[in-house]
């Protein structure tokens, strides 16, 4: 009983971050759609997931990815119909050269994310994701990340991200 409350609190905290991974340097699974679209280029087979949040808006999120393509949709009480989700993303990713991945994602709210991921070895990943308006007139922000696996397997990954929030109009 002594450990029950800390375990419930810990599991509750983990469940608040539905698909998001540790870092933009580790977008291996469904989190590739939300964090770094370059992760869609990593072959993980077909994956799908649904998350029901018991919040005041009755949020329902579902994601799918396969063969470099992925999407996620979020519905809640403010959504009006099947073809009008509250939020939606669709993206593609691929590997132009060995151990380097790139991807692009479009968001329903008129944003484009460009993502890059480099894994020279299985124990280190370097990634970045950059958000723009879908006409590329407005730069929103960039996130740069690095992650290492000190035990040389997937059981422990340590990652850190740097967010560059310097928004502004792009000049050419």
Predicted regions mapped to residue ranges:
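Positively charged n-region of N-terminal signal peptides that target proteins for export
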Residues: 1-4, 96
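Sec-dependent N-terminal signal peptides
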Residues: 3-13
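Subset of outer-membrane beta-barrel
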Residues: 16-172
């Amino acid at each position: 009983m002594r450990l029950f409350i800390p375990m419930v609190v810990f599991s509750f905290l983990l469940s608040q971050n539905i698909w998001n991974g540790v870092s933009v340097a580790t977008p291996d699974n469904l989190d590739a759609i939300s964090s770094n679209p370059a992760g869609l280029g990593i072959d993980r087979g077909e994956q799908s997931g649904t998350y029901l949040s018991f919040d005041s808006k009755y949020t329902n999120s579902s994601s799918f990815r396969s063969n470099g393509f992925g999407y996620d949709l979020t519905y809640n009480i403010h959504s009006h119909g099947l073809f009008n989700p509250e939020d939606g993303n669709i993206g593609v990713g691929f590997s132009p050269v060995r151990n380097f991945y790139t991807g692009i994602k479009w968001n329903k709210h008129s944003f484009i994310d460009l993502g890059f991921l480099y894994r020279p070895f299985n124990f280190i990943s370097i990634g970045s994701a950059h958000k723009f308006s879908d006409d590329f007139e407005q730069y929103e922000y960039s996130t740069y990340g690095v992650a290492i696996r000190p035990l040389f397997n997937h059981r422990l990954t340590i990652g850190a991200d740097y967010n560059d929030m310097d928004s502004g109009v792009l000049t050419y």
